[in-house]
């Protein structure tokens, strides 16, 4: 599932995104964010985070820097995302 989702995002980045004007209001872009979220958090949570991000990407949202959230360990402390 993870590989399929990542393949779809990469396909979009390579073949569809270059045909459209840049409109993403965030850094990293929504497609890159989704790709990183899937790689880091796995298919389900990564897809959820990606869809949630895409829904925020509209003219009424200011956008800006919005990295993939870090995982939390069992003690609720964040771990580092590299």
Curated annotation (Swiss-Prot):
One of its GO terms (cellular component) is plasma membrane. It comes from the Bacteria. It is a peripheral membrane protein. The keyword Calcium does not apply. It is found in: Cell membrane. Keywords: Cell membrane, Membrane. Pfam families: YidD (PF01809). InterPro entries: Membr_insert_effic_factor_YidD. Residues 63-82 are annotated as: Disordered. Its main location: membrane. Could be involved in insertion of integral membrane proteins into the membrane. This is Putative membrane protein insertion efficiency factor. It comes from Staphylococcus epidermidis (strain ATCC 35984 / DSM 28319 / BCRC 17069 / CCUG 31568 / BM 3577 / RP62A).
């Amino acid at each position: 599932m993870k590989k399929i989702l990542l393949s779809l995002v990469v396909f979009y980045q390579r073949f569809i995104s270059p045909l459209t004007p840049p409109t993403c209001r965030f850094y990293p872009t929504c497609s890159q964010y989704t790709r990183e979220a899937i790689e880091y958090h796995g298919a389900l949570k990564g897809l959820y985070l990606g869809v949630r991000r895409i829904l925020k990407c509209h003219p009424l949202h200011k956008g800006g820097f919005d990295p993939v959230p870090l995982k939390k360990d069992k003690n609720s402390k964040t771990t580092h995302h590299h």
